[in-house]
């Protein structure tokens, strides 16, 4: 059974899920509830809601849709590995091996030209990664293409990039077979999975008894088809937040519309049913010849493209109409915000532009608003700093006016959380006394949240480093690195002064200077500065020069040991510079991360997680390459770029919903109900963000309905 619950309020859908868990078919106590979500924030909110309702929330799993679907493949079909051999990372390394062998072929003349000057393999690695990412999307949205390419066939009407993408995909499949890895991937598994479930007279062993899908704004068509087949044996409840009670999707053709007009949704907890269309008799006039619905509400039409496609797909998989449940909640028209929401809910357009005098004088659609209505406000500010200051003032006013409102009832969603984090810290963090608001910033990139992560990336750049004095001293700003060399804040202040006054500018020594094709001068290097500092400990500058070096007088007494600590740091930097310069096979890079962390960091309780994240991601990169049998030496720069990208993708979200004001990134899946919702950084060109597609992305050049593409 597959059932879709439509409601304009997520808390109503969550209450329905609680009702089903409590009243309908209780599971075996040892069988986990399966709830598909699209973000950890949604999972946290659902757990808290369950705990509040039942007193405890335990034995609940919150998988992402892609991992859940693959897990179902493993449970239903024989000989399916737990990890796909066609994951994005695995395909990247395999393409690194395959591409050089295929470049001499005529179809690859464009790639051959692009990779002609690539001594460090950086272009090859980037091309392999981008192509793997594209194939990963094809597996979900164009699986039929890959099946044809695998059979040696081309697709009519595709752009020229197909000429090399098709044979490259076939070579990738053959290479995977040569490695002895399973050739199963999502493109060739969906049909087999669906056919197996449809042919089964009883549920295959290991399937969950019940599955909820909550808080997901869109799923790809192949996922929905797989869930539809799974629904023959499993109770599947799709809880869909739908802003409009009437059908507002598009149609395929007139016959599809004829079936749709007869469909009805069953009203929750009632015996009556409700038609999908506001007026079924005139439904045919709503659609163009192409099947596009002319929505009367302009806001829903312009902002609801993703939802419109998803509505179409949901109506297709519940073609009988018996699986649709109406749980919409009426909205009173007592404020500006509620009027807008009510218009969307009822698919109305009561807006009056008032461009002409006649339109301005009309009153049939006008609604009276309270001059003091602040349910929806827009603030135009001259800078991000001012945006955050106004936000802080408004939140204080709201909390003062409403004694029942608490900081945890407020969410601030930011279009670019990384850019606004410094301003948020400056405004919210500097407030004291009655103006202080507890707050928690989620979803920042891990690299920006932990200085140790950025310090490690800087250390991986040692082979190319000029050892500029400020860059080296900046490493000591990281407490766990400074602690490894026994340098505290006061010691760092002394060292900054000494380094500047002793004339250190850049370069470890003269040999390092010569590496940049510059003549050695014997001055302004770290070796020169350390010599001056150590001489200053042994003699005074008034005694003259020693071997043409004038002693530096400040590094004397008990604090002179700082020079030794600084020298230890520079020795380690120089040693690792030489160690990291040569390309190595992946097996030899495996232990480098642990050794560098040991040599440069003395972790404390605050940074242990960051250190573990570095090692975890490093090992994942190495293991993926080794499992893909990539055996060529690679330079450190490739591993550094990949590690940097992965750390940027890691978002720190564990403090979301922890109690203070929730400040997070703006995500369509984070539709968690709050009493106050604030948006920051909604500037032109920033949101919605326009992402230019790859020049060889065949999907962007031949678009179809690609529901959920940006959210999988």
What kind of region is each of these model predictions?
Residues 1-709:
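Polyanion-engaging groove/track-forming segments
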């Amino acid at each position: 059974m597959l059932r879709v619950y439509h409601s304009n309020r997520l808390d109503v859908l969550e209450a329905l899920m609680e009702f089903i868990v409590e009243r309908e078919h209780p599971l075996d106590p040892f069988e986990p509830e399966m709830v598909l979500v699209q973000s950890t924030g949604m999972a946290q909110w659902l757990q808290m809601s369950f705990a509040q309702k039942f007193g405890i929330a335990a034995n609940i799993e919150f998988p992402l849709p892609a991992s859940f679907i693959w897990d179902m493949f493993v449970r239903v079909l024989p000989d399916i590995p737990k990890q796909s051999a066609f994951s994005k990372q695995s395909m990247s390394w395999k393409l690194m091996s395959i591409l050089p062998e295929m470049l001499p072929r005529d179809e690859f003349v464009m790639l051959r030209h692009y990779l002609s000057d690539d001594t460090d393999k950086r272009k090859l690695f980037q091309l392999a990664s981008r192509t793997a990412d594209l194939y990963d999307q094809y597996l979900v949205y164009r699986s039929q293409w890959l099946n044809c390419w695998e059979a040696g066939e081309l697709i009519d009407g595709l752009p020229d990039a197909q000429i090399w993408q098709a044979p490259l995909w076939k070579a990738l499949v053959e290479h995977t077979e040569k490695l002895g890895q399973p050739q199963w991937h999502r493109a060739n598994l969906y049909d087999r999975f669906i056919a197996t479930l449809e042919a089964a007279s009883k549920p295959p062993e290991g399937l969950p008894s019940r599955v909820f899908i909550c808080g997901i704004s869109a799923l790809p068509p192949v996922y929905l088809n797989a869930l539809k087949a799974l629904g023959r044996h499993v109770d599947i409840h799709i809880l869909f937040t739908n802003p409009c009670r009437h059908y507002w999707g598009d149609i395929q053709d007139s016959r599809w519309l004829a079936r749709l007009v007869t469909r009805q949704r069953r009203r929750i907890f009632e015996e009556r049913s409700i038609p999908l269309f506001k007026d079924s008799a005139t439904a045919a006039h709503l659609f163009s010849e192409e099947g596009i619905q002319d929505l009367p509400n302009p806001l829903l039409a312009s902002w609801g493209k993703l939802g419109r496609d998803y509505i179409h797909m949901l109506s297709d998989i519940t073609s009988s109409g018996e699986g649709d449940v109406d749980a919409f909640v009426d909205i009173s028209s007592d404020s500006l915000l509620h009027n807008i929401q009510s218009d969307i809910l009822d698919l109305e357009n009561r807006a009056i532009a008032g461009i002409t005098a006649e339109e301005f004088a009309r009153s049939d659609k006008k609604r009276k608003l309270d001059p003091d209505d602040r349910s929806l406000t827009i603030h135009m500010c001259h800078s991000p700093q001012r945006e955050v200051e106004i936000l802080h003032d408004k939140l204080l006013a709201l909390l003062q006016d409403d004694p029942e409102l608490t900081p945890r009832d407020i969410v601030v969603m930011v279009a670019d959380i990384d850019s606004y984090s410094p301003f948020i810290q400056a405004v919210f963090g500097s407030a004291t006394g009655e103006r202080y608001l507890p707050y928690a910033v989620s979803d920042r990139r891990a690299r920006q949240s932990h200085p140790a992560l950025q310090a490690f990336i800087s250390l991986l750049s040692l082979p190319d480093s000029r050892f500029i004095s400020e860059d080296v001293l900046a490493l000591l700003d990281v407490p766990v690195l400074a602690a490894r060399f026994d340098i505290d804040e006061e010691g760092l202040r002394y060292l900054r002064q000494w380094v500047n006054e002793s004339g250190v500018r850049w370069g470890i020594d003269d040999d390092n200077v010569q590496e940049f094709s510059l003549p050695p001068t014997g001055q302004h290097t770290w070796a020169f500065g350390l010599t001056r500092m150590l001489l200053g400990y042994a003699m005074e500058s008034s005694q003259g020069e020693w071997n043409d070096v004038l002693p530096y007088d400040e590094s004397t007494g008990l604090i002179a040991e700082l020079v030794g600590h600084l020298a230890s740091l520079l020795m380690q930097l120089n040693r690792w510079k030489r160690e990291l310069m040569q390309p190595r096979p992946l097996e030899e890079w495996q232990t480098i991360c642990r050794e560098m962390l040991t040599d440069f960091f003395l972790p404390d309780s605050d940074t242990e997680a960051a250190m573990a994240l570095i090692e975890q991601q490093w090992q994942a990169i190495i293991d993926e390459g080794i499992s893909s049998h990539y055996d060529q030496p690679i330079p450190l720069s490739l591993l550094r770029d990949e590690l940097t990208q992965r750390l940027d993708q890691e978002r720190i979200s564990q403090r979301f919903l922890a109690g203070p004001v929730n400040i997070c990134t703006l995500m369509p899946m984070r539709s968690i109900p709050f009493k106050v919702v604030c948006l920051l950084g909604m500037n032109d060109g920033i949101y919605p963000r326009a992402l230019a597609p790859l020049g060889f992305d065949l999907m962007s050049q031949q678009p179809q309905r690609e529901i959920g593409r940006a959210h999988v």
